[in-house]
Every structure is written in structure tokens, then in C-alpha cells.
Amino acid sequence: MATHIAMPVNIVPELTLEQLRALPLVDEDFGTPEGAVLCLEAAYRRKSIEAVCACKNFMVEGTVALLNVDEDLAHDPEVRNKNALLTERAFRKAITEAWPDLKGVESFFTNRQAYHDGFVVVVEIRRSPDGKFTKHNHLVANTHSGWRVLNEVSDDELD
């Protein structure tokens, strides 16, 4: 179903911390892909599974996953509905069993690239309180209710 990305490894960002902090600020809202990522992270910090799920779109995420497996299945409404439900259930279980710890994490958005019509990948560099940096490639979709975060993709999927 969903692509599982290995735990992010520490990186050395191309920009200095001073340069990262000088990047334009992003509003925490669903008006931009980056804002949707910030909404998701804020919901993680509050440990609110309902707020987290409101930042995502499981129908779109599940359909993208089906397209990667079998295009015919992705066009079957019953299969898409069932897959969306299963994707959401699995996500809720995984998150509530192991909430991401984003306390004190700084987020910097360094790139946005087109992925497909209505989809972009937002590259986020996170700096943890211990000074380590990690890179995250968020697949984000423009939906009827604004931008929604789907899942992370690997660098290999972007090439």
C-alpha cells in the first residue's frame, strides 16, 4: 500500500543555518504545500490524530499507491474506497503507536518541484534541538479543500 521510507539519515545541508533561517517564512495553512506540511507537524506536536488526518487525503494517497501497482485497480471506485480506508486505518495505528517527536524541531523549506499534475514534492530540512539535520521529501496534493500532505518519497523516486 503506502511506501515506507527508512528513517531519515543525518545530512549536511547545502545552506548554512544562517541562510536557512533567512528563508521566507511560511504560513501554517492549507494555501500552500509548505503550509500544509507545517499544519501536519503542528498536529503531530499536539498528538491529535484527528487533526493529523485532516492534513492528509487518504483517497488521493491510496489512489497514487494503486496507480503504482495496477492502473486498472486505481480506476475501480470500490477498490479505491477500500484502499483509502485501509490506508487511513494503518496510518492511524502506526502514528498513535509511535508519535513523531517534533519538539523543538525547526523546519526549512528549500525546494518545491512538480511531481505530476496537481502534485508537488516539497523538500524540507529539519534541524533537531541537538543540531542534527534531516531531509524530508513530502508528496503534497492540491485538493478541493486545499493542499494536503500524502506521504514521503525517496530521492530515487524523484529522479
Positions of predicted regions on the chain:
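Short beta-strand segments enriched in hydrophobic/aromatic residues
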Residues: 44, 56, 125-127
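Hydrophobic beta-strand residues in large extracellular and virion-surface proteins
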Residues: 37-40, 107, 121-125, 139-140, ...
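Surface-exposed, charged secondary-structure patches
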Residues: 25-29, 33, 61-133
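Solenoid-repeat scaffolds in large eukaryotic assemblies
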Residues: 51-53
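Short, low-complexity N-terminal intrinsically disordered segments enriched in polar/charged residues
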Residues: 1-49, 58-62
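Short beta-strand edge/turn micro-motifs at domain boundaries
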Residues: 1-23, 130-159
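Residue-level detector of alpha-helical recognition elements and their boundaries
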Residues: 55, 67-68, 155
